[in-house]
Amino acid sequence: MKRTFQPSNLVRKRRHGFRARMATKAGRKIINARRAHGRKSLSA
C-alpha cells in the first residue's frame, strides 16, 4: 500500500507557501492571524 505522505517541496510551496496564502482572502486571514499570534514562521 502506498503511504499518504509523499514529500515534495514544490507541491508544499505551491499549496501552503506564502504566495499561495496571499492569493486568497482566507489565506490572507491565516497570515494575519499567525502574525498577530507572533509566529516565527508564517507559512511553508
Curated annotation (Swiss-Prot):
Gene3D superfamilies in alphabetical order: 1.10.287.3980
Name listed for the protein in its UniProt record: Large ribosomal subunit protein bL34
UniProt-listed HAMAP family: Ribosomal_bL34
Similarity comment: Belongs to the bacterial ribosomal protein bL34 family.
Record organism: Roseobacter denitrificans (strain ATCC 33942 / OCh 114) (Erythrobacter sp. (strain OCh 114))
Keywords: Ribonucleoprotein, Ribosomal protein
Record GO biological process: translation
Top-level taxonomic group: Bacteria
Record's keyword annotation contains Ribosomal protein: yes
